[in-house]
Amino acid sequence: NAVIPFEFGPVGEVSAGDPLGPDDFGYICFDSRDEEWVDHPVYDWVEISSDERDADFPGTKIDFEFPDRQEAWDSWNSTEVVELPFTFRYYGTDYDSISICTNGWISMGAEGAENRSPEDWAIPGPGGADALLNVYHTDLETSDPSLSGVYYHYLEDESKFIVEWYNHDFGGQTQLRQNLTFQVILYNPSV
């Protein structure tokens, strides 16, 4: 056995303008700040809320069912399953549906529908949904159900499925009324 000494040279500094990864599956996470990279996203907001006057497309509002409100933490937490118009591969598994939660997350498949927690649990773990995609995961509420909601829409000609949380607030924080609106777009991987 021989010991061969060596030193690492500088490889540069990681900055907010650099992507994260790759992980064990080869995924790399780019965001809009990674402008120096060829693969950085250029986000094109597509408004699908029927509550918005300038909606680009009419989204379908999810009619969430709220369980027995026996627990204070569970007052506005719900998850519903929506069928995808294409098969979506996520970490090596194909899915034909997603579970959409009022608390700003989706999970691949129908198994996540049993979970509606606003808590940040380990992925995977007994307290959270598996195959999770945290879009803006926190305890969220609708300030006025007639003026807010969660919508989805499929743009067939562009092969993208959009989920939008429209006009939500931080849960239980009346002083933090934010009217949060955010969305995630899933692209058909076969196109």
Feature locations, PLM:
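Von Willebrand factor type D
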Residues: 11-191
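Feature for long, exposed domains in two main contexts
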Residues: 1-13
